[in-house]
A protein has these predicted regions:
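Interdomain "pre-motor" coupling segment immediately N-terminal to P-loop NTPase/helicase cores
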Residues: 39-98
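Short glycine-/aliphatic-rich beta-strand segments at the starts of folded cytosolic domains
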Residues: 1-18
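Short amphipathic alpha-helix segments
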Residues: 15-32
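Intrinsically disordered, low-complexity mixed-charge segments
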Residues: 2, 8, 72, 90-98, ...
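Conserved helicase motor core of SF1/SF2 NTP-dependent helicases
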Residues: 44, 106-234, 238-322
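Compact, well-ordered interaction domains used in eukaryotic information-processing assemblies
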Residues: 28-29, 34-37, 43
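Conserved loop-to-helix interface motifs that mediate assembly, gating, or partner/ligand docking
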Residues: 88-109, 113-116
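Hydrophobic side chains in well-ordered alpha-helices
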Residues: 19, 57-60, 245
Length: 322
């Protein structure tokens, strides 16, 4: 196939560094992921390859240059997101992901959505009392939920954060683990702790938990309570029974928000027990202040090496089947 060439004019020599990063790591990433060759010379970027691949590279570079021209720092996750969006024919919406900063993490780094699915999710939480986030692992559901909860707490919109999940895990009975129920469920809430530590830092998280402003508890602890002025997150909701889900949702109090996250492809309940998450989708879809946001594989933005590992395993599986 005939090789195509595109020249892209930059506005300033410094743009090359801001665009491609130290040691041109972003340039190499674009070459690898888009199957093109890129030559960067002062204020001209030349892209070589098949016409469609060159066009994708041009769109990625121009989208990233919008961020550069706004004085924003372009990091590897931004490049990965742009590449993912151009492959999904969504690059025209890339810049909209950067219109709003949700909050800064404990190092001062801004936290923003990374995919259109994440943007829909954040917008839904702002507009609804109860938001269900349904989709595969790695889509950022837990991290975003905790981020939105901390943001609401810092703005004085709620007085406390409550994080919970059902005590069910694949192939493992919690009845055989030592300690009380809270101690048993805590190891399975690790993603929640990780998110809190990244956003608030470990010390502030610990202080807020000691003051019971942040509460991390098993789902069983929610029974009989009415949760006013609270931001309540239920994680791993696919493993709730119908009665557990009903019990949880009816805890909603005044001036509160609820997020229910789960992945219906990873249900660990006994085969004859219907998931409360699937049941809720069917029963609650027409309630005005409840919204369902569905994530897909497009919302998984892995590290470039992880993306290559996944592809290698997929290729290996295909070869094995041939």
């Amino acid at each position: 196939m005939k090789e195509h060439s595109i020249d892209i004019q930059l506005s300033h020599p410094d743009d090359l560094f801001h665009l491609f990063g130290s040691n041109e790591r972003h340039l190499r990433l674009m070459e690898e992921e888009l199957d093109v060759v890129i030559h960067a010379r002062t204020e001209i970027v030349q892209v070589l390859g098949e016409e469609s691949a060159c066009e994708e590279a041009r769109q990625v570079i121009q989208a990233l240059m919008v961020l550069v021209n706004r004085g924003m720092t372009v990091g590897t996750p931004d490049v990965v997101t742009a590449i993912s969006m151009v492959k999904n024919d969504e690059i025209d919406k890339f810049v909209s992901l950067y219109e709003e900063e949700i909050i800064k993490d404990n190092t001062g780094k801004p936290i923003r959505v990374k995919t259109l699915g994440q943007k829909l999710y954040v917008d839904s939480v702002k507009q609804h009392d109860v938001t269900f986030g349904i989709g595969p692992a790695g889509t950022g559901k837990t991290f975003l939920a905790v981020t939105l909860a901390v943001t609401a707490l810092k703005r004085g919109q709620v007085k406390r954060i409550i994080l919970t999940r059902p005590a069910v895990e694949a192939g493992e009975s919690l009845g055989f683990l030592p300690g009380d129920l809270k101690e048993k469920v805590d190891p399975y809430l690790r993603p929640v702790y990780d998110a809190l530590y990244q956003i608030l830092g470990k010390d502030q998280t610990t202080r807020l938990m000691e003051r019971e402003i942040i509460e991390i508890a098993p789902l069983a602890y929610m029974r009989g309570r009415t949760l006013d002025d609270a931001f309540v997150i239920l994680d791993e909701a696919q493993n709730t029974t119908i009665m557990q889900m009903k019990m949880f949702l009816t805890r909603l109090g005044f001036h509160s928000k609820m997020i229910v996250n789960g992945d219906i492809s990873q249900i660990d309940l006994p085969r004859n027990v219907k998931s409360g998450l699937i049941d809720a989708q069917e029963k609650l879809k027409n309630i005005h202040q409840i919204d369902f946001v569905h994530f897909s594989a497009k919302d998984v933005v892995p590290h470039p090496v992880v993306a290559q590992i996944i592809r290698a395993y997929e290729y290996s599986t295909e070869v094995a089947h041939d």
